[in-house]
């Protein structure tokens, strides 16, 4: 943001309560000079704008890549789990696997290649499943008794975890 567009009122609103025309005060304490605070405010606005633009670019990129990544994951799962009696399908937007009364859903992240896997196994508790998963994976708590959510998995890791927890 251009320094000339930043008004004294904007600086006072961002940093303090009152001004004497030179400094900004919060209560009885001087926060800083208006000129210095204008520079700081301009940097903050520019930083926020840059971050927002980057985030929007990444989000748009992910949206564009998601359909292909989901289809690729579905084909990969079908190939890897072909010898097991399972159903691989896309439920709304993400791939799912139903195998041996387990329901597995994958949340695909096309940008990083690290995906999330949720498994609902009516025959095992979440704590039992967590014990069988390697310690290097991040496991999120779930309020459901027979559900586990594992973060940061590659495609190969997903297949191995499904085999471990659902076979």
From Swiss-Prot:
<dbReference type="InterPro" id="IPR020367">
    <property type="entry name" value="Host_transcript_inhib_Alc"/>
</dbReference>
<keyword id="KW-0945">Host-virus interaction</keyword>
<comment type="function">
    <text>Participates in the host transcription shutoff by causing premature termination of transcription from host DNA. Acts as a site-specific termination factor that abolishes transcript elongation on cytosine-containing DNA but not on the 5-hydroxymethyl cytosine present in the viral DNA. Therefore inhibits as well transcription from other phages that contain cytosine in their DNA.</text>
</comment>
<dbReference type="GO" id="GO:0039653">
    <property type="term" value="P:symbiont-mediated suppression of host transcription"/>
</dbReference>
<keyword id="KW-1190">Host gene expression shutoff by virus</keyword>
<dbReference type="GO" id="GO:0039657">
    <property type="term" value="P:symbiont-mediated suppression of host gene expression"/>
</dbReference>
<dbReference type="GO" id="GO:0003677">
    <property type="term" value="F:DNA binding"/>
</dbReference>
<keyword id="KW-0238">DNA-binding</keyword>
<protein>
    <recommendedName>
        <fullName>Protein alc</fullName>
    </recommendedName>
</protein>
<keyword id="KW-1261">Bacterial host gene expression shutoff by virus</keyword>
<keyword id="KW-1263">Bacterial host transcription shutoff by virus</keyword>
<dbReference type="Pfam" id="PF17527">
    <property type="entry name" value="ALC"/>
</dbReference>
């Amino acid at each position: 943001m251009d320094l000339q567009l930043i008004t004294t009122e904007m600086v006072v609103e961002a940093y303090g309560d009152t001004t004497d025309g030179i400094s900004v005060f919060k209560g009885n304490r001087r926060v800083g000079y208006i000129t210095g605070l204008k520079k700081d405010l301009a940097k903050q606005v520019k930083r926020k704008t840059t971050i927002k633009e980057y985030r929007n670019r990444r989000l748009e990129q992910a949206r564009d890549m998601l359909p292909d990544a989901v289809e690729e994951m579905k084909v990969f799962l079908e190939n890897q789990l072909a010898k097991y009696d399972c159903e691989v399908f896309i439920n709304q937007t993400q791939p799912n696997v139903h195998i041996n009364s387990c329901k597995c859903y994958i949340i695909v992240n096309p940008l990083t290649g690290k995906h999330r896997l949720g498994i609902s196994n009516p025959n095992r508790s979440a704590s039992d499943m967590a014990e069988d998963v390697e310690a290097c994976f991040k496991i999120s708590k779930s309020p459901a008794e027979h559900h586990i959510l594992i973060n940061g998995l590659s495609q190969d890791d997903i297949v191995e975890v499904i085999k471990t927890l659902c076979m």
